[in-house]
């Protein structure tokens, strides 16, 4: 019981007295309900309505005031909680009258409670009384009260009154006798407002201590609490009381102490954070616990309803309003003293001795026999339980040993079975390259769809590549895919095992056969769906080429026919000793121009126009699937075979229709492109000449395809795509790594740029995604006509310069002087150096990633075929140069992060001596700090004119990142990705390079 609670505030309004009635004084206050009082005088500046816990009107008797406003607080003293009851108000408002009745009713209830519970607890009541007269404390129970008492501070009890007499009550009559003495000793006087006016503050204190009659650890403590009945003297005005002399002096002391009480109440109502002036008055000092400490408090404010006391009544209500907000923290007071505990134990010991004496000898002997019998039974039970425990322990040990043996044997069996299984699988894998499920899986992935190519052309992702390099094993993959499915399935696992393990291996083989059969069925279903989707994709791609081309575009049909004628001429040399070598070289060369895998080779053949070869390969793919299906005899596989056959016929019809349509769609401008190679067709009949011509024709086809893609935005073929797909959807339409789709991506990017779409190029970032946006719409808004015409002029210039390059190269071939690709005349080399210098300067201005600079610098070294890529790079950097200042800061931050990452790679890539050589080479002192970071900050610095510095920077970065030799990677794989793309690098995902160099193989 106890805790924080607010003071219980009640207001009692007395009726008009005889003097007020004689003066015809009006009643201005009215109680509208049990909690609200209002003022009927409307000239008040402040509010006229007040709400309290309880409001008592004229007709309410003192008994009701006690029951509703003070009884609960007064009786909590019996539970060990301190309590206080105040009577506050102006002079002649009825304070003494109210407190006399409340004191009497409270004493009656307290003694009634004691009489009811005296069998359970022992109560001790102590009574003391004092008054504060002219700021002097007097003892009301002492006859000689002329000597004032001092106030002392006790660390346990707080403020105490020295030498205050405290009487222990015998009964109720004794209390009444003491109350009458207090009434006689209290100072009273007569004023003009009250004939019997109290001239002092009276405090009656009743202390109650209670302890349990029966001893127990829970009830050994003693409850000690006190209740205070405080009858305050009324505040008065000298002008109203007409006091003088001693009465005036008394009134001054009364008002001063009440003013201090009001100040304390007001500050307590606002919280206990500041200083509370308890010591400014002896009244507040004595009642400190009652006001804001360990006690429950009830205040009864009395007031007069007369208009003549209106201001005093309002002050009383304001005091009550503040007191209503004061919070006290009452706690139960437990007194656990050693003396009380010793006394309680002594009483309990005496009681038990008396009970023992009262027991007779007969009863004692019978009791001892009974206890002896019970003790014997308990001992027997304990012995029996010990035997059971011993037996259970033995059983537990046996069970544990069995479990351990079982676990050991199981582990040995698993290890032996796993070793046999791994050896058997190793023998099986050595005997054949593919089993049935893997054959179908590889067949589907090679000819129909490659999941590794998914997302290759996305504008915001980086493709994931396998760790191995497909260039080294291109011939092996080509040969493996051309094998017949029956040959791959003829291998049968033959495992010879020991006689002791034959049965286990046989069971394992049966399980493996079941698993492989299920995998075969699942792969078969997935490959059937992939075949359908692949055929649909082929139809869609072929349909794109059947659309009419733009007026100023070049014809691809003528070039396709040249490629076919060249291939036929190569086939005529089957009798030559170099036949096989030439076929392998052509296959490898075409694959290097586009991609690194078997499905990409087939897509490259589609792009270059070898439709007959494409048809043959697709038919071969379908035949492979049909032959692999013959190993299964189910009805479902037969149905699938029929579906694939129908797809094959549709594909053949579509291919033949497309070829027939394109015979009528060859513009006359194709002659200009074919003239480049006409002179060499008659003379170059050797193997080297044919190989060189095929290579040059492939590059020319690629160039004209890129030009066509840039201008295709006005052609019907591109309009079809543009009408059906939004720009954002068109970038995500296809995710293949084929040559055709690389060109389609370039086409879509150019068209979207002309229409005002936004391309995003994101520099490499190592702590956050930093995106630099090129808003083509802003360029279009500034000067739409100029932008469109400049783009066409740029593409026309590229086409004209490339024709010049090819014409020069054609003249060289007429003279049968074959120059290496990395050689050029003095004028072209000077032009290349000029473009290279401009690109390096723009790299520095645009904060291009260092890895991009390195690979571009190492890959493009001045070959005639590098001209287009140098122009595209210059065009891209010129767009980036116009980016905003915010984007420039973000890209600079990304380059700084890249340098920090490269600095971390130096200790991983070089040994101690090699690192010192690198530091010395780049002018970094060995005794300095953060030497690796100093080196990386010197890479690709502002010295853009120094080509040797650029070479050394590119060489070091290539070593740190782990670039493969640039000759093994086709330039088209890097050059075609120079269109604006988006790449993001996050700290959690490690390194992801941009699409400009994401197709490069890395080592280390």
Curated annotation (Swiss-Prot):
There is a cross-link at residue 881 (Glycyl lysine isopeptide (Lys-Gly) (interchain with G-Cter in ubiquitin)). Residues 6-326 form the Kinesin motor domain. It comes from the Eukaryota. Residues 335-402, 517-576, 634-661 form a coiled coil. Signal peptide: none annotated. One of its GO terms (biological process) is microtubule-based movement. Residues 569-582, 634-652 have a biased composition (Basic and acidic residues). Keywords: ATP-binding, Coiled coil, Isopeptide bond, Microtubule, Motor protein, Nucleotide-binding, Ubl conjugation. GO terms for cellular component: microtubule. GO terms for molecular function: ATP binding; microtubule binding; microtubule motor activity. The keyword Cytoplasm does not apply. ATP binds at residues 89-96. Residues 567-599, 628-671, 802-830 are annotated as: Disordered. It holds the Pfam family DUF3490. Residues 653-663 have a biased composition (Polar residues). InterPro entries: Kinesin-like_fam (IPR027640), Kinesin_motor_CS (IPR019821), Kinesin_motor_dom (IPR001752), Kinesin_motor_dom_sf (IPR036961), NACK_C (IPR021881), P-loop_NTPase (IPR027417). Belongs to the TRAFAC class myosin-kinesin ATPase superfamily. Kinesin family. KIN-7 subfamily. This is Kinesin-like protein KIN-7I. It comes from Arabidopsis thaliana (Mouse-ear cress). The gene is KIN7I.
């Amino acid at each position: 019981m106890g805790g924080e609670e607010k003071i219980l505030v009640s207001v009692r309004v007395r009726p008009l007295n005889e003097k007020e009635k004689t003066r015809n004084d009006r009643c201005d206050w009215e109680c509208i309900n049990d909690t609200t009082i209002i003022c009927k005088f409307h000239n008040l500046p402040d509010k006229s309505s007040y709400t309290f816990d309880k409001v008592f009107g004229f007709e309410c008797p003192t008994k009701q005031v006690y029951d509703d406003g003070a009884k609960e607080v007064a009786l909590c003293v019996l539970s060990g909680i301190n309590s206080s009851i105040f009577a506050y108000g102006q002079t002649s408002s009825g304070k003494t009258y109210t407190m006399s009745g409340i004191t009497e009713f409270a004493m009656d209830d307290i003694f009634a409670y004691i009489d009811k519970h005296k069998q359970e607890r022992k109560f001790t009541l102590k009574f003391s009384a004092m008054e504060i007269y002219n700021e002097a404390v007097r003892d009301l129970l002492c006859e000689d009260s002329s000597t004032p008492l001092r106030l002392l501070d006790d660390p346990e009890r707080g403020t105490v009154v020295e030498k205050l007499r405290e009487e222990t009550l015998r009964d109720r009559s004794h209390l009444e006798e003491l109350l009458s003495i207090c009434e006689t000793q209290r100072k009273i006087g007569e004023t003009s407002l009250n004939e019997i006016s109290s001239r002092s503050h009276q405090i009656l204190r009743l202390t109650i201590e209670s302890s349990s009659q029966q001893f127990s650890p829970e009830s050994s403590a003693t409850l000690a609490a006190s209740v205070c009945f405080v009858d305050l003297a009324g505040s008065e005005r000298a002008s109203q009381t007409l006091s003088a002399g001693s009465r005036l002096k008394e009134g001054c002391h009364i008002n001063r102490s009440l003013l201090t009480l009001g100040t304390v109440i007001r500050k307590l109502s606002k919280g206990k954070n500041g200083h509370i002036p308890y010591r400014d008055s002896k009244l507040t000092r004595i009642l400190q616990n009652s006001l804001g400490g360990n006690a429950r408090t009830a205040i009864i404010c009395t007031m007069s309803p007369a208009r003549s006391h209106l201001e005093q009544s309002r002050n009383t209500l304001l005091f009550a309003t503040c007191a209503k907000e004061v919070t006290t923290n009452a706690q139960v007071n437990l007194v656990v003293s050693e003396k009380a505990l010793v006394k309680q134990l002594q009483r309990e010991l005496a009681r038990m001795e008396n009970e023992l004496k009262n027991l007779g000898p007969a009863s004692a002997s019978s009791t001892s026999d009974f206890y002896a019998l019970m003790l014997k039974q308990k001992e027997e039970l304990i012995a029996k339980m010990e035997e059971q425990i011993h037996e259970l322990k033995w059983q537990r040990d046996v069970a544990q040993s069995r479990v351990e043996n079982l676990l050991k044997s199981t582990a040995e069996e698993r290890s032996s079975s796993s070793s046999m299984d791994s050896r058997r699988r190793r023998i099986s894998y050595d005997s054949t390259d593919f089993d049935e499920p893997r054959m179908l899986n590889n067949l589907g992935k090679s000819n129909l769809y490659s999941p590794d190519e998914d997302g290759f052309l996305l504008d915001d992702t980086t493709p994931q590549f396998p760790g191995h390099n497909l260039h080294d094993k291109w011939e092996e993959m080509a040969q493996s895919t051309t094998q017949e499915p029956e040959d791959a399935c003829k291998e049968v696992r033959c495992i010879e095992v020991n006689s002791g393990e034959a049965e286990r291996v046989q069971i394992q083989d049966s399980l493996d056969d079941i698993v492989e059969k299920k995998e075969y069925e699942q792969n078969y279903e997935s490959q059937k769906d992939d075949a359908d989707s692949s055929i649909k994709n082929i139809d869609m791609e072929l349909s794109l080429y059947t659309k009419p081309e733009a007026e100023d575009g070049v014809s691809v049909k003528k070039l396709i026919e040249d490629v076919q004628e060249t291939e036929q001429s190569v086939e005529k040399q089957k009798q030559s000793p170099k036949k096989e070598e030439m076929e392998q070289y052509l296959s490898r060369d075409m694959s290097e121009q586009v991609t690194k895998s078997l499905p990409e080779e087939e897509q490259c053949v589609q792009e270059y126009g070898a439709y007959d070869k494409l048809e043959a390969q697709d038919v071969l793919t379908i035949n492979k699937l049909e032959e692999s299906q013959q190993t299964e005899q189910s009805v479902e596989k037969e149905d699938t075979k029929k579906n694939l056959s129908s797809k094959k016929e549709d594909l053949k019809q579509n291919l033949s229709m497309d070829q027939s349509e394109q015979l009528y769609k060859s513009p006359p401008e194709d002659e200009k492109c074919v003239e480049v190679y006409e002179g060499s067709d008659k003379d170059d009949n050797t193997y080297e000449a044919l190989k060189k011509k095929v290579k040059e024709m492939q590059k020319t086809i690629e160039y004209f395809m890129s030009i066509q893609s840039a201008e295709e935005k006005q052609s019907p073929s591109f309009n079809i795509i543009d009408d059906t797909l939004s720009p954002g959807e068109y970038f995500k339409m296809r995710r293949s790594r084929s040559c055709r789709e690389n060109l389609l991506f370039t086409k879509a990017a150019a068209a979207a740029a002309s229409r005002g779409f936004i391309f995003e190029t994101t520099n490499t970032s190592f702590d956050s995604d930093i995106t630099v946006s090129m808003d083509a719409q802003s360029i279009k808004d500034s000067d739409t006509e100029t932008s469109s015409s400049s783009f066409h002029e740029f593409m026309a210039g590229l086409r004209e310069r490339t024709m010049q390059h090819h014409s020069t190269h054609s003249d060289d071939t007429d003279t049968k002087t074959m120059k290496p690709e990395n050689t050029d005349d003095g004028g072209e080399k000077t032009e290349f150096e000029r473009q290279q210098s401009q690109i390096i300067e723009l790299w520095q201005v645009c904060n291009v990633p260092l890895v991009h600079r390195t690979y571009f610098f190492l890959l493009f070294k001045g070959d005639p075929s590098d001209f287009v890529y140098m122009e595209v790079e210059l065009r891209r950097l010129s767009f980036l140069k116009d980016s905003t200042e915010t984007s420039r800061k973000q890209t600079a931050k990304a380059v700084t992060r890249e340098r920090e990452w490269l600095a971390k790679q130096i200790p991983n890539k070089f040994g101690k001596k090699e690192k010192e050589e690198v530091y010395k080479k780049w002018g970094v002192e060995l005794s300095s700090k953060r030497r690796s970071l100093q080196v990386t900050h010197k890479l690709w610095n502002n010295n853009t004119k120094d080509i040797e510095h650029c070479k050394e920077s590119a060489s070091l970065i290539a070593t740190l990142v782990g670039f493969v030799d640039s000759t093994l990677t086709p330039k088209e794989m890097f050059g075609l990705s120079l269109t604006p793309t988006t790449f993001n690098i996050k700290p959690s995902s490690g390194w992801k390079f941009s699409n400009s160099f994401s197709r490069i193989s890395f080592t280390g």
